[in-house]
């Protein structure tokens, strides 16, 4: 008997799916907002929320664990210094998804994923 998977496969092989999610998460943290299909954004949201939760405690171990997923040092530093301090008091729900409707051409459900609160302006 088949049971429901805990994630969406996105019609890709595991290496392609992982690379897609990694690139989308990096773009999300870089621009603090991303637009794509609703299905892809559900998976990006799951990863992004886990990474923000991990980044709330700034330790060497957590930085090394997140650097396995985020290879850009600027984005990694931004996550630890600007994004995660805003969410220290929040126990989850760091992102929101705004549905845009159907895309012209293939009628795919489109959406925008953004952070609930704006990151700190640290200079």
Swiss-Prot record:
One of its GO terms (biological process) is translation. One of its GO terms (molecular function) is structural constituent of ribosome. It comes from the Bacteria. One of its GO terms (cellular component) is cytosolic large ribosomal subunit. Keywords: Ribonucleoprotein, Ribosomal protein. InterPro entries: Ribosomal_bL17, Ribosomal_bL17_CS, Ribosomal_bL17_sf. Part of the 50S ribosomal subunit. Contacts protein L32. Belongs to the bacterial ribosomal protein bL17 family. NCBIfam families: L17. This is Large ribosomal subunit protein bL17. It comes from Borreliella burgdorferi (strain ZS7) (Borrelia burgdorferi).
């Amino acid at each position: 008997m088949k049971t429901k998977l805990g994630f969406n496969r996105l019609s890709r092989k595991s290496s392609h799916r992982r690379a897609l999610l990694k690139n989308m998460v990096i773009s999300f943290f870089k621009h603090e907002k991303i637009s794509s299909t609703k299905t892809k954004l559900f998976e990006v949201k799951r990863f992004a929320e886990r990474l923000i939760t991990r980044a709330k405690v700034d330790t060497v171990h957590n930085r090394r664990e997140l650097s396995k997923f985020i290879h850009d040092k600027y984005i990694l530093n931004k996550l630890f210094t600007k994004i995660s301090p805003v969410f220290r008091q929040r126990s989850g729900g760091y992102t929101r998804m705004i549905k845009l409707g159907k895309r012209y051409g293939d009628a795919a459900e489109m959406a925008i994923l953004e952070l609930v609160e704006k990151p700190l302006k640290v200079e």
